[in-house]
């Protein structure tokens, strides 16, 4: 690989990096734009800007103070007494963080527009939608052998993120402003002290930190994809000359004996293994049909790659090798596995008949009942064993509102996990929510669950049905076998746009139960 080609790839679409962004922080309309943008993203990020209020006077005072003082030369003693982060004026911190996140996204937006106009979108960028994950799992996983379950490492030093953005933004004052907020922010430790994945963020300055993390991952993936594409175009060695060479050295040295059955194993090192890369939140997978030896090489290559290119320390235990035929993969809230589905086929030719065993790999997705029950337990819908309990906090609400809340949680979970091939665990989750709702209503009216269910009848259960179940029960009320077969079919619904909540069970239940 030539150095100039590698540098040329890194400089691709960076023609907007010389833009001066810092003067925009002194423009009042940028603050209004950031505030409106935050309100529009409330559904996705649950962050309605800075306290849902746009105060023109606060913005005016902030810009005047930024003109008068140099806030980026700070001593240790002055750090806690800075005007941006003094106790009565913490809103300045949030205002500037919102504005900075809008300003610094400009080079990336211009780069996207430039790519669309010039039609320079690369193939690796075509399928970046979260909804493309599910068809990929269903179509490709049954043909793969190994999966690298990867937890993407985070930078151990704040300067690494600043260095990453320097490729795109060469505006020194903007980078100084970024350093200032990174070292000040109290959210930084909570953002990168991750237990399992990047799914838990504080509401304050959420968009700011989300942009920083995405820019870091984007830079890592751009270099990684380039190296993978270069390795996939390596020419394979012609097997005939390889066999003759091995035989020659075996005869001369008298040290090894080469058998024909070993040739195919050797040739794997000269063939394209057809790697598949999927990332979601702080977790990614690298799937392949390669051998165990080659997948181990990829594992240690990733560790060295992060250390050499990004100065990020990553331990090999953060990358787990999963053999799909033996273990399940926990990804996007599903337990995915590949099982061997055998079927007996009887074939008859003239007077002779043959019985053949036909084995087909089948992709299975299972609803993870234990994590979901644990999340329901933390949200006080059941105990740790999965026994439904009442929700005392909701007893002050009206009956219809209580039923609507329980029904919405049940329908959302059912809607997302409709792509599961085995829905036994899903039925148990529905049972917990239905009985918890009944016990909450019974507690409110000071009656028993049995008498309350008798009074409501089947109308109570219909509130927990999804729209698909209602349609099936209306169209096929008599043919039970057909309706059950249609309901048990695997259907991926692509109208779910907040999938990040569902991929994390605890975050999902806690969010919906508020």
Curated annotation (Swiss-Prot):
<keyword id="KW-0507">mRNA processing</keyword>
<keyword id="KW-0819">tRNA processing</keyword>
<keyword id="KW-0934">Plastid</keyword>
<dbReference type="InterPro" id="IPR024937">
    <property type="entry name" value="Domain_X"/>
</dbReference>
<dbReference type="GO" id="GO:0008380">
    <property type="term" value="P:RNA splicing"/>
</dbReference>
<dbReference type="GO" id="GO:0003723">
    <property type="term" value="F:RNA binding"/>
</dbReference>
<dbReference type="GO" id="GO:0006397">
    <property type="term" value="P:mRNA processing"/>
</dbReference>
<comment type="function">
    <text>Usually encoded in the trnK tRNA gene intron. Probably assists in splicing its own and other chloroplast group II introns.</text>
</comment>
<comment type="similarity">
    <text>Belongs to the intron maturase 2 family. MatK subfamily.</text>
</comment>
<dbReference type="InterPro" id="IPR002866">
    <property type="entry name" value="Maturase_MatK"/>
</dbReference>
<protein>
    <recommendedName>
        <fullName>Maturase K</fullName>
    </recommendedName>
</protein>
<dbReference type="Pfam" id="PF01348">
    <property type="entry name" value="Intron_maturas2"/>
</dbReference>
<dbReference type="InterPro" id="IPR024942">
    <property type="entry name" value="Maturase_MatK_N"/>
</dbReference>
<dbReference type="GO" id="GO:0008033">
    <property type="term" value="P:tRNA processing"/>
</dbReference>
<dbReference type="Pfam" id="PF01824">
    <property type="entry name" value="MatK_N"/>
</dbReference>
<keyword id="KW-0150">Chloroplast</keyword>
<dbReference type="GO" id="GO:0009507">
    <property type="term" value="C:chloroplast"/>
</dbReference>
<keyword id="KW-0694">RNA-binding</keyword>
């Amino acid at each position: 690989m030539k150095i100039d080609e590698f540098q040329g790839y890194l400089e691709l679409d960076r023609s907007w990096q010389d833009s001066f962004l810092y003067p925009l922080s002194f423009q009042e309309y940028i603050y209004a734009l950031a505030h409106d943008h935050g309100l529009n993203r409330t559904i996705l990020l649950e962050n309605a800007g800075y306290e849902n209020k746009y105060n023109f006077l606060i913005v005016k005072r902030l810009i005047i103070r930024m003109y008068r003082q140099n806030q980026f030369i700070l001593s240790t003693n002055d750090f806690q007494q800075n005007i941006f982060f003094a106790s009565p004026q913490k809103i300045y911190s949030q205002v500037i963080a919102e504005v900075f996140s809008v300003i610094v996204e400009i080079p990336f937006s211009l780069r996207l527009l430039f790519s669309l106009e010039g039609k320079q979108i690369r193939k690796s960028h075509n399928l970046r939608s979260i909804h493309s994950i599910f068809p990929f799992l269903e179509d490709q996983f049954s043909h793969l052998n190994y999966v690298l379950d990867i937890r993407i490492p985070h930078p151990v030093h704040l300067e690494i993120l600043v260095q990453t953005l320097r490729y795109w933004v060469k505006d020194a004052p903007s980078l100084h402003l970024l350093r200032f907020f990174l070292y000040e922010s109290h959210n930084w430790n909570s953002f990168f002290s991750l237990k399992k994945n990047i799914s838990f963020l504080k509401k304050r300055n959420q968009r700011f930190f989300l942009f920083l993390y995405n820019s870091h991952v984007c830079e890592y993936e751009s270099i990684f994809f380039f190296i993978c594409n270069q390795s996939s175009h390596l020419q394979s060695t012609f097997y005939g000359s390889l066999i003759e060479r091995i035989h020659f050295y075996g005869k001369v040295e008298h040290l090894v004996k080469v058998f024909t059955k070993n040739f195919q194993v050797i040739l794997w090192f000269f063939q394209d293994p057809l790697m598949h890369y999927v990332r979601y939140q702080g977790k990614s997978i690298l799937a392949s049909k390669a051998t165990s030896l080659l997948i181990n090489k990829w594992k240690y290559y990733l560790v060295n790659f992060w250390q050499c290119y990004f100065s990020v320390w990553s331990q090999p235990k953060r990358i787990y090798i999963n053999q799909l035929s033996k273990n399940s993969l926990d990804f996007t809230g599903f337990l995915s596995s590949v099982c061997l589905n055998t079927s007996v086929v009887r074939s008859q030719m003239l007077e002779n008949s043959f019985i053949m065993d036909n084995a087909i790999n089948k992709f299975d997705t299972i609803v993870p009942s234990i994590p979901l029950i644990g999340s329901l337990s933390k949200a006080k819908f059941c105990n740790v064993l999965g026994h439904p309990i009442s929700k005392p906090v909701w007893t002050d609400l009206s009956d219809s509102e209580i039923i609507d809340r329980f029904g919405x949680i049940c329908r959302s979970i059912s809607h997302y996990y409709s792509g599961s091939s085995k829905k036994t665990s899903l039925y148990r989750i529905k049972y917990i929510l239905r009985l918890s709702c009944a016990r909450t209503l019974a507690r409110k009216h000071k009656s028993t669950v049995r008498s309350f269910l008798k009074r409501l009848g089947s109308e109570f259960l219909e509130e927990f049905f999804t729209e698909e179940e209602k349609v099936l029960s209306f169209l096929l009320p008599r043919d039970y076998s057909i309706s059950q077969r249609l309901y048990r079919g695997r259907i991926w619904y692509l109208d779910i746009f907040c999938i990040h909540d569902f991929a994390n069970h605890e975050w999902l239940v806690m969010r919906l139960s508020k």
